[in-house]
Amino acid sequence: MSAILPGYAELHCQSNFSFLQGASHPEELVTRAGELGYAALALTDECSLAGVVRAHVEAREQKLPLIIGSSFTLQAGADAPPLDLTLLAQNREGYGNLAELITLGRGRAAKGQYLLTPADIEAPAGDNAHLRGMPDCLAILAPPPGLAAERLAEQARWLAAQCPGRAWIGLTLLHHCRDDLHRAAVEHAAHASGLPIVALGQAQMHRRSRKPLHDTLAAIRTGRSVGQCGYDLAANAERHLRSRLRLASLYPAQALAQTLAIARRCTFSLDELQYEYPDEIVPAGHTPASYLRQQTYLGARQRFPEGMTPAVAAQVEKELALINELRYEAYFLTVYDIVGYARSQGILCQGRGSAANSAVCYCLGITAVDPARGNTLFERFISKERNEPPDIDVDFEHQRREEVIQYIYEKYGRQRAALTAVVISYRPRSVLRDTGRALGVDNGIIDAVARAHQWWDGKKEMLRSLAACGLDPASRVARQWAELAETLMGFPRHLSQHPGGFVISRGKLSRLVPIENAAMPGRSVVQWDKDDLDALRLLKVDVLALGMLSVLRRALALAGQRRGRPLALHEIPPDDDATYDMICAADTIGVFQIESRAQMSMLPRLRPRQYYDLVVQVAIVRPGPIQGGMVPPYLRRRQGREDITYPGPAVRKALARTLGVPIFQEQVMQIAVDAAGFTPGEADALRRSMAAWRRKGGVDKFRAQLVGGLLARNYTADFAQALFRQIEGFGEYGFPESHAASFALLAYASSWLKCHEPEAFLAALLNSQPMGFYAPAQLVQDARRHGVRVLPADVLYSGWEASLQDAPGAARPAVRLGLNLVKGLREDSARAIEQARVRRPFADTADMARRAGLPRQALDALAAADALRTLAGHRRLASWQAAASAQSRDLLREAVIVETETPALPAPSEGQTVAADYRSVGLTLGRHPLALLRPQLAARNFQTAAVLNTYPNRRLARACGIVTVRQRPQTAKGTIFVTLEDETGPINAVVRPELIERQRRELLDATLLGIYGTWQSVDGVRHLVAQRLVDLSSLLGQLSQDGLAAASRNFH
């Protein structure tokens, strides 16, 4: 039958990257077009190219010609209707013009919007003059059905004049009651303008079954329920990709033939895009290659004062030769320049990821991992056979990274530099809220269901939540809600900005990819995300934020002040026994990477005693090694409970440092090369497939080559198959060795500071919030258990940030909390207090309020936080004086006023004080809340953490504490790990799926949780395996009328 059907190319198709309009993914549209036998498909999202790379990749798989285009609504003024225009790129020049037009429209409007007028096509001004008539683009007028015939004819004549020989008028027939009138109007306009008519489907769905979702998106877009949308809903489901048989019955043959004529003229492919690196960093008299060589060897003299070893020197030369062959010098120099700027400003930074495999990056100061210390594999970073740009990730202090970002913008300009986009997609709770509102569900039910839903919950749990909220799961509304939520999950909602992935080009970046405004002032983003850039092999530079770098710089500065001389990162002793003793004891709250529950459970078993042990420690607690079954054999071998064996010398070479067990991706690559006969490029392709095998089954295509290569070199079939199973495990997230090596340096440095400079480390952690695994309350409690004296925030002594304060006769300083912990206090108010205090001490609260010019809100916040205690007494007195002081007028700011006598108000109880501390500062320096509740808890036989830690293995036990962390790792098969805190320390608990099923509410809702279970203590790892849970949060109400506001860290 296909032989007698007319050919057809859909020239107006919108995906779900026309946010809240299209109801299908780009890949779904491409696949469906291929199934229907279309000659081509044009993706024409509204003023956007955000979905074209996904469509391009799928079209390449389907061998379907993809036309790159975009649709626009041009605002013609108050007296004229908008003009709906579709533009299609004929060639590379046309594509660049299209991308620039999108950039122009997006740049004029707030995030997520655009503004274009007919004048932007007819007579664009200034730098955009070359866009006049949109050269090398084909233009199709796509009028709505209700547009008056004369208005349509007027628009057609205008378009014919602007794009002579490149313009059409589109006819869209969707089985509307006015199709005949619309067709007549189009024919009239075509006759009046001389434009040919072309068939347009204006598809927004790949199948008609998406119509309910299409209606739901319209409701979400307009902020109403589906029942209230009326004519804003499509009248039927015809805006899907229709069969050619159906199209032939609707459209004139000539209109269908025109689609093929247009498709033949549009020959552009995204594969034609060529990226050019910035080149202005190279000074006169140098080529990029000579300048990179010069800077590399200058850096080598600093990195290796006694000279490079022959192996390192050979590695540098090998890398420089390959970089030169692939013409990547400008990329390395761009990153070198950015890192150089950061260092010149005193901003701590460090490269990580596969770049740490590079000796050149180490010499340039981009990375901190000495290639002589590691088992680097340069092919993990750059491969000639891969023929794609390397990826250099550089971490900067999170509180100063914006300075680096603005430097890049200033150096290269907004026309040449922009951040990578991140596609924000629907997640469970946002899906439930939006679809529930669209269906008209009561807001109370929506809130209850959304709050109860967790990221791992499926349709069954949602229906159970509906039942708990009084909605019949079998009802039509419940079923629709569940089905729509399931379909909408993962749909793109809007574009956001990447944490720091920059695209920088030699010429106009807007001719490569459209640029639009970000929500944050002073930022702009391209319309593609990192996966899009990778798919097209386009370069990006990752300027990332890392909180621990802020902590390290601050802690080193504070420690240097205490010691009376500067302390630098490289001066930290590398093999400190006390530091490793602390690490082995899992005493790592607050340190980098090894502070999580899983890492702390592993530390007593792995017992790191040197740097490379930390590299393994950082990497081994990852889904990849866990799923691949690498962890148990490594631990057994490390603990001497299993022989260390190697099937052959090539395997020994790759795995000797990890006791014969593959932990890192680089090791798999090396085995593939040395033991299975892979080329370095093939090995890297294997590595890349590891991350994609669950999605695409890509790793399977290497099974025969890997297993066959091992068998051909006399390795056993058992070993070959076992190795491949381990490789499959890397399909889950795992660290490359180079990445783990970079992070291990920071893990050790932060551990050393915690061990030897605990006061400076705590102050730095508090001043670098928000970051890390633990809230300030847990960090302070842990520090105090280690003997650190912590003083409260006080307006007479505190600055905005925490500081070190000496005390007469004390061997070590105390940590004075900063005013930044006071909830509701602005930084400018705290700075004003500091400045006024320098001039002369405050006489009382009123004196401080007048001289610092504090508003009533600031005074109330300080009183609530007990930061006025030295001036005014306890909280109630302070609140009274704050209220009285707020009446002072600005003109009396410097006058001395005699206040009326403050009434004798009773001091709050200890419990009230503790509760108020948590509400106003987020922590307490008084007794722990559970110390106050201990008599009630002891009556129920709940033991403290200190007592539990003395229990033998498999003893029945009871614990109670404030929930500080809930975690559900994907590798834990549904188990949730809970951390409680009492007055003596943390308690780790394990909650199995069957108990979660029975006591979900207690587990997820309790602030104070009691756990009955069995204590486990093996190899220094201790936890309570839960058998019953009790929500004891009501006990906290005894501390004060308002209870205790303590937030846990849930499932982050």
UniProtKB/Swiss-Prot annotation:
UniProt keyword terms in alphabetical order: Cytoplasm, DNA damage, DNA repair, DNA replication, DNA-directed DNA polymerase, Nucleotidyltransferase, Transferase
Oxidoreductase among keywords: no
UniProt-listed Gene3D superfamilies: 1.10.150.870, Metal-dependent hydrolases
InterPro entries: DNA_pol3_alpha_NTPase_dom (IPR011708), DNA_pol3_finger (IPR040982), DnaE2 (IPR023073), DnaE2/DnaE/PolC (IPR004805), DNAPol_HHH (IPR029460), NA-bd_OB_tRNA (IPR004365), PHP_dom (IPR004013), Pol/His_phosphatase_N (IPR003141)
Location of this chain's protein in the cell: Cytoplasm
Reactions accelerated catalytically: DNA(n) + a 2'-deoxyribonucleoside 5'-triphosphate = DNA(n+1) + diphosphate
EC number: 2.7.7.7
Enzyme class: transferase
GO BP terms, alphabetized: DNA repair; DNA replication
Keyword Methyltransferase recorded: no
An example molecular function term from Gene Ontology annotations: DNA-directed DNA polymerase activity
Main location: cytoplasm
SMART domains: POLIIIAc
GO CC field: cytoplasm
Function: DNA polymerase involved in damage-induced mutagenesis and translesion synthesis (TLS). It is not the major replicative DNA polymerase.
NCBIfam families named among the record's database cross-references: polc, PRK05672.1
Family membership noted in the UniProt record: Belongs to the DNA polymerase type-C family. DnaE2 subfamily.
PANTHER family, A to Z: DNA POLYMERASE III SUBUNIT ALPHA (PTHR32294), ERROR-PRONE DNA POLYMERASE (PTHR32294:SF4)
Name of the protein this chain belongs to: Error-prone DNA polymerase
Organism lineage string: Bacteria, Pseudomonadati, Pseudomonadota, Betaproteobacteria, Burkholderiales
